């Protein structure tokens, strides 16, 4: 990568052409000598007329030409009367508009800012400024000055301007004092710096911080890392090795630090089968409250009723179907007990059973709500039931606090307006979302949960579906009979063979499951691209963007998503003068690209056919419809929702011609292409292969190594995931 020469430039702001108040990204014109310079980067709030000294480097933009990329921004207040007027007229101080700015500067000239700060009573000499307004003007000016002083102080600690903005938003005017005393506070909730970054900032401080802060932050960092790997808790003894390595200390010190964190309530301890486990408090609360809510439903079940055989017979006749014994059992359980987990693999009739339950609920006059974890899963649920379905977030009427944490309007104090709720794709739901969902259920509400326990666990923390089934306390019906029509599909047959640990049939032709063998990762990647771009569209009329999805076990390697996305972008959406593009890191985003959101962003606004809303979530797939280089905004269609985002939000996207199996969960696609070659051992599990295979509705093509496909089908090991929901469901109530 080319290394740019770092330089410093200074000048007066002529105009701020773009500024994002959320993250500080700014584009401005700077008068530096006789030159008008475009400067871009993360900067604090700025106004025309301010004097800046910028550190950074020159860069060349394909559309806008030469720009100065800002890494550090220092600024001074304007000194000349002309610059002061421009600053005030641009809204530099709250309460002063352009006309009032002229009056003030005409009267006080170069002394204007000094008077605003130190002698604001004199402002009341000007018509239109009352003594009270003069005080407000001065207070706002001083607040801005304080903010800038804080930014300067923080930059001395090696923090970038973007980091300073984040710290100030979290800590306010006390930011510099807090960080000087305890830089590891930056790792806390609402700030989110990595432990390693806090270590570097700590090294820049004039005095080393208390080592206790560092030890506690390090232990919490290890706990958070476990959380990101899906664990809700961790055995205490498992903490010693990573903590001693990270902190370069001994086990006794780690042990003492853990006790301190437990004593202060920042960790929670619970013994499970005579083994001590550690939890972060909010996860402990989520698992325990979920178990308590489920036990409450079991103790005081919804008012069920006897389900007569003739009612089920009537549904069969109405829909022209015949239920199997297990399907009838599931319907009876849902009606009579009001609580059910319905599970089973593809082709076992989960959807048919679900529709029968739904029709009987409605026949009883119940108001039924349908929900799923993702937008695509909710859309599919709506299609197969013929009724509206929402994401769990929308069902709970989510709002977001200043730290981007979900706050649900529907909760125990304001429960859902429903008498029955059906929740699909339960295997994808993590424990924190499940806890919020259960909290919002009204007393007496019937609950049917649907999922496939053989799929991968959720990306987030917890193992909700598995733990509830394993507890044995929740009514479960597992559909095992594969219906004849479904068995005509080799996708369905092979999915069930994989679940049983049997090798899938790979040599059958003229079906819906195909295998193209190669032992070369390079050839496999090229084959995948050709299948998506040419062969499947030609044979079946599929759209490469809308109907075909490449699903990879891993990101890395020749057949990982990173490389295949580059290959397929070059094939399906090559550079063209009519397609504006921009580069973020190593990724080119071009008009027409298929993209995916990689983290929850609760602030993105969107419009759709059913109304407007906010929030685009991790795993949402869309098409980049327009890249506007002038406004630095991008338009993306996520299914039927149109979102317009600033360029800086593109860093939360990645190309989605190929996605990982984990990211594909909850989605189904008409055609799936899956390269299986060189899969890392940590991912070469049966449930990963099974989850990928069951994403395909009509056509599946596996490309790669026959021996690896067979070995994955035989490998029933699963990545160990520590969770406690089963324990809390089984533990005696106090």
Question: Where would I find each of the regions flagged by the language model?
Answer:
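Conserved helicase motor core of P-loop NTPases
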Residues: 453-614
């Amino acid at each position: 990568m080319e290394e740019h020469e770092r330089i410093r430039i200074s000048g007066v702001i002529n105009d701020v052409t773009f500024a994002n108040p959320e993250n500080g990204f700014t584009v401005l014109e700077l008068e530096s000598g006789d030159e008008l310079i475009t400067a871009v980067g993360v900067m604090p709030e700025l106004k025309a007329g301010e004097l800046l000294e910028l550190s950074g480097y020159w860069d060349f933009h394909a559309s806008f030409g030469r720009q100065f990329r800002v890494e550090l921004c220092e600024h001074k207040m304007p000194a000349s009367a002309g610059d002061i007027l421009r600053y005030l007229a641009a809204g530099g101080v709250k309460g002063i508009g352009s006309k009032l700015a002229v009056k003030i500067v005409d009267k006080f000239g170069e002394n204007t800012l000094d008077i605003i700060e130190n002698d604001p009573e004199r402002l009341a000499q000007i018509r239109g400024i009352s003594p009270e307004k003069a005080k407000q003007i001065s207070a706002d000016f001083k607040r801005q000055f304080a903010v800038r002083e804080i930014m300067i102080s923080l930059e001395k600690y090696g923090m970038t301007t973007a980091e300073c903005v984040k710290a100030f938003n979290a800590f306010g005017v006390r930011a510099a004092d807090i960080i000087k005393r305890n830089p590891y506070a930056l790792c806390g909730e609402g700030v989110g710096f990595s432990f390693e970054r806090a270590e570097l900032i700590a090294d820049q401080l004039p005095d080393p911080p208390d080592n206790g802060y560092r030890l506690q932050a390090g232990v919490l960092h290890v706990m958070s890392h476990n959380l990101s790997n899906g664990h809700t808790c961790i055995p205490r003894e498992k903490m010693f090795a990573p903590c001693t390595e990270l902190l370069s200390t001994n086990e006794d010190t780690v042990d003492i630090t853990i006790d301190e964190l437990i004593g202060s309530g920042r960790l929670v301890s619970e013994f499970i089968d005579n083994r001590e486990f550690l939890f972060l408090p909010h996860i402990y609360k989520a698992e325990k409250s979920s178990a308590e809510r489920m036990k409450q439903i079991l103790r005081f079940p919804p008012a069920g009723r006897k389900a007569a055989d003739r009612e089920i017979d009537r549904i069969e006749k109405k829909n022209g179907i015949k239920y199997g014994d297990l399907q009838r059992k599931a319907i009876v359980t849902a009606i009579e007990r009001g609580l059910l987990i319905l599970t089973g693999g593809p082709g076992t009739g989960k959807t048919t059973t679900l529709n029968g339950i739904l029709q009987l609920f409605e026949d009883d006059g119940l108001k039924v709500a349908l929900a799923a974890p993702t937008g695509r899963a909710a859309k599919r649920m709506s299609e197969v039931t013929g009724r509206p379905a929402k994401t769990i977030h929308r069902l709970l009427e989510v709002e977001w606090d200043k730290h981007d944490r979900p706050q649900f309007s529907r909760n125990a104090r304001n429960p859902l307006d429903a008498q029955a709720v059906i929740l699909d794709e339960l295997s994808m739901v993590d424990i924190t979302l499940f806890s919020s969902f259960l909290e919002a259920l009204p007393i007496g509400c019937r609950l049917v949960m649907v999922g496939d326990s053989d799929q991968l666990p959720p990306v987030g923390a917890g193992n909700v579906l598995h733990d509830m089934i394993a507890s044995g306390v929740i009514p479960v019906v597992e559909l095992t009979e594969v219906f004849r029509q479904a068995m005509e599909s080799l996708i369905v047959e092979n999915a069930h063979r994989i679940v049983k640990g049997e090798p899938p049939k790979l040599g059958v032709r003229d079906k819906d499951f195909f295998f193209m063998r190669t032992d070369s990762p390079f050839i496999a990647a090229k084959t995948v691209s050709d299948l998506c771009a040419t062969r499947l569209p030609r044979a079946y009329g599929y759209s490469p963007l809308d109907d075909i999805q490449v699903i990879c076990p891993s990101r890395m390697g020749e057949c990982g998503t990173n490389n295949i996305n580059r290959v397929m972008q070059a094939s399906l959406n090559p550079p063209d003068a009519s397609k504006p593009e921009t580069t973020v890191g190593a990724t080119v985003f071009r008009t027409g690209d298929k993209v995916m959101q990689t983290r929850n962003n609760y602030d993105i606004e969107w419009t759709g056919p059913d109304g407007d809303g906010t929030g685009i979530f991790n795993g949402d797939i869309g098409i980049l419809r327009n890249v506007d280089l002038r406004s630095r905004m991008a338009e993306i269609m996520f299914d039927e929702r149109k979102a317009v985002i600033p360029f800086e939000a593109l860093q939360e996207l990645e190309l989605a011609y190929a996605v990982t199996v984990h990211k594909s969960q909850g989605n189904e696609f008409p055609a799936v292409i899956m390269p299986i070659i060189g899969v890392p051992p940590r991912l070469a599990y049966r449930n990963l292969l099974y989850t990928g295979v069951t994403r395909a509705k009509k056509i599946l093509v596996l490309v790669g190594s026959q021996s690896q496909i067979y070995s994955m089908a035989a490998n029933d090991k699963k990545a160990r995931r520590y969770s406690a929901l089963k324990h809390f469901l089984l533990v005696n109530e106090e």
